[in-house]
Amino acid sequence: MRGRANQAEPGADYGIDAPRAVRNAAIAGLAGSLLASLSYSVLRSWHRTLARRALALGACAGLASLLFVGVNLWSSRIGKLRARDGIIGAIPWRGDEAVLDVGCGRGLLLIATAKRLPDGRAVGVDIWDASGESGNRPEATLENARIEGIAERVEVVDGDARRLPFGDESFDAVL
């Protein structure tokens, strides 16, 4: 069961962190590797040492880019789930709290908290940015809550953290 705790329900999607950076790194790594191969092919008959250095430089750039992509994908799909479990698990929940998640995004902390609140409620507030590549929309958060089986305990609200649309002492905890 321990391994399962660090996973989302199948189908729940909490997103890839910095998707544009991941895409750009993958493209740069591929382009660098192709350019290095092309440089090697062109230079090898003229200057072997220079050709080898160009190939080595391109290979290093390609590997560094692939490493960045791999680490980012791992942290987006596994690492942040482990961090979430550590954060949420460290709080002694009663189960009846009202909890606010400020900047909830796709609901990673919001939904994990709602699972610990059988008699409580979890409210997520965010400035939704559907134009970005992250897919940060209230519908995505609510869909993740449905997939995780706690949709009835989750509410999402459009709001700015600098001017929250709630009265004082509306919540027992804020994430």
Regions found by a protein language model. Give the residues of each.
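N-terminal auxiliary segments of SAM/dcSAM-dependent transferases
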Residues: 2-62
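Class I SAM-dependent methyltransferase Rossmann-like catalytic core
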Residues: 14-29, 65-87
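A short acidic, Gly/Pro-enriched loop at the edge of an enzyme's catalytic core
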Residues: 94-97, 162-174
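Conserved class I S-adenosyl-L-methionine
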Residues: 95-105, 123
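Conserved SAM-binding loop of SAM-dependent methyltransferases across substrates and taxa
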Residues: 106-118
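Conserved acidic residues
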Residues: 126-128, 160
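Short, flexible/disordered intra-domain loops and linkers
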Residues: 128-136
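S-adenosyl-L-methionine
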Residues: 135-160
